[in-house]
Amino acid sequence: MSIFVANKEIAERKDIINPNLINNSATLNGFFNAYGDLPQIDDAKYQGLRVINQTNMQWRGSGPYMYVQKGTYTFSCYAKTSGLGVKSIMIPLNTGLDGKDKQPATVNTQAMAISSVSDWSRFDCTFVVSEAGYIHPRVESSGNNDVLLLAGFKLEKGSVATPWCPSINDLATGLLDIQAIKSKLGGVKLLYRIYYATSLKEVA
């Protein structure tokens, strides 16, 4: 099953969207760095998504903590960067910090460098989990004076990155919120639509 908020053209192309396994990827609720700090949120949004501002933050990347089973996964996000430090997508727990109370997953990819880009670009990293456990997908910078803006985190099964979408849980919550608004307004029809697409693919 693939469920997401998007336009009709995308919704009808059932072959290109995989469910997002990350909850709250638009709001960034439940995102932390290895020290337990909440992410710094930028005032601006990108495509309606809240933006993590990791400017001047060395090795303090924020992301969700997730328990994953064995298999192949792809992580992707939007990024806008500058500065001389190396920026990298990191998947495993930060050994010695956030791995103290969590069983870490065994993954074949420790880090994947991404380029510095002055305009928003989407980056992705495919990795294989050989032993189930926790991961902490995030983007880190090695420099103290770098600009690193991030949005639209997505984790999906398989080796292909597909367009960002909310998780199925997020969409279900959104539908309940919409129903509550409609009831409050006396059944007034809202001026937008939520499209969804389904297939027989396993998602959990």
Where in this protein do the model-derived segments appear?
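Secreted extracellular polysaccharide-interacting domains
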Residues: R50-Q69, S88, K100-Q110, I135-R138
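Extra-cytoplasmic beta-strand recognition segments
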Residues: T27, T55-I89, F123-V128, G152-F153
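Short edge-strand/loop segments of extracellular domains
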Residues: P92-K100
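Extracellular beta-strand-rich recognition modules
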Residues: F75-C77, G133-S141, F153
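Extracellular carbohydrate recognition and processing domains
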Residues: K100-Y134
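Short, surface-exposed loop/turn segments at beta-strand-coil junctions that are enriched for proline
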Residues: S82, V128-A132, S142-N144
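Extracellular polysaccharide-targeting segments
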Residues: M1-G30, E140-E202
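Short carbohydrate-recognition loop motifs
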Residues: G36-Q58
